[in-house]
Amino acid sequence: MKIGTIKTLEELEAVRAYWERWQDHPNNDFAQFKMVCQLRPEVESPCVVVIERNGQPQALLAGRLEKTQFAPPIGYIKPVRIPAKVMAVLHEGILGQVDDEAVLESVEYLWSLLRSGVADAIEFHHLSEDSPFLNALQLHRSGWFCDPPPRWSVHWEMTLPAEGAFIEHKVRSKHRTGIRKKERDLESAFPGKVSWRWMNRFDDIPGMCARLEEVAARAYQRGLGTGFMDNEEYRRRFALFGGRGQLRIQLLEIDGRVRAFWFGYVYQGVFHLSETGYDPELSKYEVGTLMFIRLNDELAKEGVRTLDFGIGDALYKRRFGDRSWQETTVWLFAPTAKGLALRLIMGLLSAVDKFGRNVIQRIGILDQLKTGWRRRLAPRKSSADPEYPMTEKI
């Protein structure tokens, strides 16, 4: 077995055929990975670990070297920001087939990279609870230079009804009347002006991005530095997935203006939800729920049978999801003074965050506090639907 690292875009071409054969998620898509490495200023280079056996790649760890700000959060607050070089292994970034031997040797290889000074830390973003790498990283910890015990989050999926009619199959009867009333109220408030548009073909990507930006600019995600933004990266991402026929966008237009949106990507038969936003003036009509119902009906018509809600838990995911698993982000820190300092800071802030969450959960006001913080972070006079947050590192 041989393990090495690719650190240039040119070298990536040597494993491209294997990568594209194994890719199964928008996050680990080769073309998108390459695009992000080219566009994001914080990305110093690719850092892809290649595991070979008998001269052929057996597996890949898709990562990037990033000059970033190490900023462990307490809730939505990031009290410290420390410049650091981090090797970020993407969510769903483990490609190919790995056995126990390959996993153990790969973990040792990653520690050797840290000892050599390649990075101050390595981040495995949201490893699944059944990942062999998670088990190996937990078993072969290196004392002070591993992160605290796992902080789990729940990842949800949903099976779509084959015959459509999402509201009939997934919404309880006592809620259907209320949802239909909200829809009638919306139509009454804007008679003849409401249009729901499902888009799977795109002729004007820049124009579409500009229209979405009118809504996204007022969303709370913008205050967090997440969510959709009309920039070169999103335009090229839309062009990439739209050109393949994988991009889907649900729009609510009123009098020709976009007032709400939700988009995602169909990838190997699974729809991956991405970003959403809506005009806060429409909050009383629960347009997030109305969009979600239409989106699922349109997907069912196309033959899509699985919807992936993406990273993180939320009330609507628990309400509609029918399959879930746990995930956690794992950090390894370089055996240096800086690595130790980063580890200690993460341990302290994680302990404060955990204590605060436990207190808030016992009081029973966690959801209310989340909503309040999101509204506070949103630009003045606006917010996005607090029950529909979407963030995912790619």
Functional labels for PLM-detected ranges:
Residues L39-E42, A84-A88, L95-D100, E157-E163, ...:
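Low-complexity, flexible helical/coil segments
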Residues S45-P46, E52, K67-P150, Q268-Q326, ...:
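Acyl-donor binding region in acyl/amide transferases
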Residues K78, V89-H91, P150-V154, E183-L186, ...:
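Short, surface-exposed, polar/charged, turn-prone segments marking secondary-structure boundaries
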Residues L65-K67, L134-F166, I254, E302-G364, ...:
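Active-site/acyl-donor-binding loops of N-acyltransferases
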Residues K2-V80, H126-H155, T159-K284, S382-I394:
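A conserved beta-strand-loop-helix scaffold within acyl/acetyltransferase catalytic domains
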Residues T371, P379-R380:
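Acidic, carboxylate-rich catalytic segments that either coordinate divalent cations
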